[in-house]
């Protein structure tokens, strides 16, 4: 018999229905559930797949470099970053008529092209790339690295090169390797690149492989380093009149603590960033020498955790038993990693616009909007995944005996208190915030806008003032001219900080008012509700009052039959499924807020946001409707323009999003009827009927249909907003 998909499951591969295909796809990456799997094989497969993942990332980055070098305008852009539009790649499309060809021929290109809104041009420019040859070199190098990683992936699946299970569970060695080797040494290498290549390039020099070892990045070379006079490296920084990419106004410092932004590029000082990476390198290289491996010195993670016991009171056994629980559970480790990565990704979104590291990024409004939105959505999905794997940990890997009375067990024991507090916070935020918005709407509708309830965010304004923002008149800490901190700051540390905080040219500390107060609490509602659903799903994964035996049913199940009430829609998977809708909803509010506040600032029209954001009609009319006008009229009987593709994507995104409801509301999405109709027509068509459909179409399971519905809802939602964001921003600012 010919082996059929999925090879990893004997039972599924013999299923005569379309369930075989659906369940095969659903469990393809659930290595734990595959036939003949062992713990060792599981670890080896995951290890090899990491190399494959890295190879894909390097291939993708290589493709970016290659296509810009081949079809972009990097060298032209470098001459005038503020006025030349960066080209991502050419468009070859047989459907383009003459109007489309003309509309998409821009940025000095000979034919239709896509404009880059990813910020890669600014990134490459900042780190010292200047011409197409540099881009090609980078592309070829990354291609070689990708090939190397693919080879490593294959190699580590060969019998002689398979790592043992004990190697994978050697937590201290892995910590040392990741801290010192990956974070520490790579930060040191990046410091080296910034000092030897990027900073000289920014000052009009040109350093490449042929003169890298002969060009000293500082006039005094390594002398100050060996003599202990490190402060020499911070003397004579670039002046405020420095022209980026030239020696006009350039200094000689390589490690500084200036603070604020380069006045021309509106990005962080390169010498500050080199200093930052050097500090990170030192800290992490030291951190990577702290854990005990072959040499019998340093800390043992197990001893550290076992020592974490409350000194008295009825506080249980602290972190006892956690070492083995974490070290033997891939889901626990993945949950921790995803939670950390999710937070970091969201922080990247926040910092890329408030403290831009790349030259001229702050003046490329569409790119800023795209990068913020992109990183916030990615963060949302990653964070939801953290809770999903946390729930799977409780179902598959949690051992109550091993964790008796430690922090994990105690968290499960008082889960009702955790869940009810989250519920209370969500209800409070929801009713009060909506109440304020609706009250304000009614006042405007009845012609008495002065009766709105407008609350100044005084605590947040006070915090901004403490950090040096003077416009609120609080006169506290750094915003007080008499405080020792603000006096020291002007000379000793970060002298550029106070200027940056009080400048209107950046997004560092935006002025906030009643509209910000309201939307802040709307976002807080979304965050708390999403967290409530996810936390409840994980904490109730093993069992709840309604269903104490839930852990026998696994991660996802629709119901326990018709005879047992209260068992529907309460699996841990269902919590994840519901939470993703709330996550998307919350990030919708976050990105709406960010985008509307910024376009009004960029247009010099901050009053529009301040006046219209205090009631819901303001958001619907003055943000969504007003900014979608170009999309709604993107192509019409009189022709099209360079926004037409976004107008089409806006429409298409709505279509995909709406398709989700076919699966979400009627549950099964008519899969059985659809496929049977297609198969019937296929088998009655000459030539086509030579190939016959063998799998009997059966209705999607409830869980499958929810997944398909959720996937369409998410993809459509993001497509729609991406088109709206890019078109409305690029339509205004070019």
From Swiss-Prot:
Binding site for chlorophyll a B1: 654
One of the Pfam families matching this protein, by short name: PsaA_PsaB
Cellular localisation: Plastid, Chloroplast thylakoid membrane
Membrane topology of this protein: Multi-pass membrane protein
Leader sequence residues: none
Catalytically driven reaction(s): reduced [plastocyanin] + hnu + oxidized [2Fe-2S]-[ferredoxin] = oxidized [plastocyanin] + reduced [2Fe-2S]-[ferredoxin]
Entry-linked InterPro entries: PSI_PsaA/B (IPR001280), PSI_PsaA/B_CS (IPR020586), PSI_PsaA/B_sf (IPR036408), PSI_PsaB (IPR006244)
Protein task: PsaA and PsaB bind P700, the primary electron donor of photosystem I (PSI), as well as the electron acceptors A0, A1 and FX. PSI is a plastocyanin-ferredoxin oxidoreductase, converting photonic excitation into a charge separation, which transfers an electron from the donor P700 chlorophyll pair to the spectroscopically characterized acceptors A0, A1, FX, FA and FB in turn. Oxidized P700 is reduced on the lumenal side of the thylakoid membrane by plastocyanin.
Listed NCBIfam families: psaB
Protein name per its UniProtKB record: Photosystem I P700 chlorophyll a apoprotein A2
Gene assigned in the entry: psaB
């Amino acid at each position: 018999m010919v082996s059929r998909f999925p090879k990893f499951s004997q039972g599924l591969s013999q299923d005569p229905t379309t369930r075989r295909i659906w369940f095969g796809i659903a469990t393809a990456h659930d290595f734990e559930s595959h036939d003949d799997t062992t713990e060792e094989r599981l670890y080896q497969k995951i290890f090899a797949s990491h190399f494959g993942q890295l190879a894909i990332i390097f291939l993708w980055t290589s493709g970016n470099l290659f296509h810009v070098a081949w079809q972009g305008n990097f060298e032209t852009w470098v001459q005038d970053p503020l006025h030349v539009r960066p080209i991502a790649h050419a468009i070859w499309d047989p459907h383009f008529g003459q109007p489309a060809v003309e509309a998409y021929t821009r940025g000095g290109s000979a034919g239709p092209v896509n404009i880059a809104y990813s910020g890669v041009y600014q990134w490459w420019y900042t780190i010292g790339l200047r011409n197409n040859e540099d881009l090609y070199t980078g592309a070829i190098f990354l291609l070689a690295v990708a090939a190397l990683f693919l080879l490593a992936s294959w190699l580590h699946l060969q019998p002689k090169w398979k790592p043992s299970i004990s190697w994978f569970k050697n937590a201290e060695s892995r910590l040392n390797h990741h801290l010192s080797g990956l974070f520490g040494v790579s930060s040191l290498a990046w410091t080296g690149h910034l000092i030897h290549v990027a900073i000289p390039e920014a000052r009009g020099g040109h350093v490449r492989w042929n003169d890298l070892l002969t060009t000293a990045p500082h006039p005094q070379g390594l002398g100050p380093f060996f003599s202990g006079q490190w402060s020499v490296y911070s003397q004579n920084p670039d002046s405020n009149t420095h022209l980026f990419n030239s020696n006009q106004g350039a200094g000689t410092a390589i490690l500084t603590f200036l603070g604020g932004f380069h006045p021309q590029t509106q990005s962080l000082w390169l010498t500050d960033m080199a200093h930052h990476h050097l500090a990170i390198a030192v800290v992490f290289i030291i951190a990577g020498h702290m854990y005990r491996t072959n040499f019998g010195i340093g800390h043992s993670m197990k001893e550290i955790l076992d020592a974490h016991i409350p000194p008295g009171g009825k506080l249980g056994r602290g972190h006892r038993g956690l070492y083995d629980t974490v070290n033997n559970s891939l889901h626990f480790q993945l949950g921790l990693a995803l939670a950390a990565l999710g937070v970091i990704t969201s922080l990247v979104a926040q910092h890329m616009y408030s403290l831009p590291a790349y030259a001229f990024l702050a003046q490329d409004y569409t790119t800023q909007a795209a990068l913020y939105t992109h990183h916030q959505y990615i963060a949302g999905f990653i964070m939801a995944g953290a809770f999903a794997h946390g729930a799977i940990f409780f179902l598959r890997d949690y051992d109550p005996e091993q964790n008796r009375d430690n922090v994990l067990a105690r968290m499960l024991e008082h889960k009702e208190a955790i869940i009810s507090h989250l519920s209370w916070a969500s209800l409070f935020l929801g009713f009060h915030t909506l109440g304020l918005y609706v009250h304000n709407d009614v006042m405007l509708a009845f012609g008495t806008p002065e009766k709105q309830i407008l609350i100044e965010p005084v605590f947040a304004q006070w915090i901004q003032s403490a950090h040096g923002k003077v416009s609120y008149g609080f006169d506290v800490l750094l915003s007080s001219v008499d405080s020792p901190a603000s006096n020291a700051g002007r000379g000793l540390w970060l002298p550029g900080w106070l200027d940056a905080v009080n400048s209107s040219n950046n997004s560092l500390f935006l002025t906030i008012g009643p509209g910000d107060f309201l939307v802040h609490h709307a976002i807080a509602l979304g965050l708390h509700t999403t967290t409530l659903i996810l936390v409840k799903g994980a904490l109730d994964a093993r069992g709840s009052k309604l269903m104490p035996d839930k852990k026998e049913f696994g991660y996802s199940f629709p119901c326990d039959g018709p005879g047992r009430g209260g068992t529907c829609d309460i699996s841990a998977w269902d919590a994840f499924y519901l939470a993703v809708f709330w996550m998307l909803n919350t990030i919708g509010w976050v990105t709406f807020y960010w985008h509307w506040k910024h376009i009004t600032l960029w247009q010099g029209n901050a009053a529009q946001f301040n006046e219209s954001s205090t009631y819901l009609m303001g958001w619907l009319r003055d943000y969504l409707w007003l900014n979608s006008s170009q999309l709604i009229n993107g192509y019409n009987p009189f022709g099209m323009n360079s926004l037409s593709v976004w107008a089409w994507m806006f429409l298409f995104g709505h279509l995909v999003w709406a398709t989700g409801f076919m699966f979400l509301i009627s549950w099964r999405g008519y899969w059985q009827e659809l496929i049977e109709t297609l198969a019937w027509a296929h088998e009655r068509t000459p030539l086509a009927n030579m190939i016959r459909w063998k799998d009997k179409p059966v209705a999607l399971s409830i869980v499958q249909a929810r997944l398909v519905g959720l996937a369409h809802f998410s993809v459509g939602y993001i497509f729609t907003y991406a088109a709206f964001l890019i078109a409305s921003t690029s339509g205004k600012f070019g």
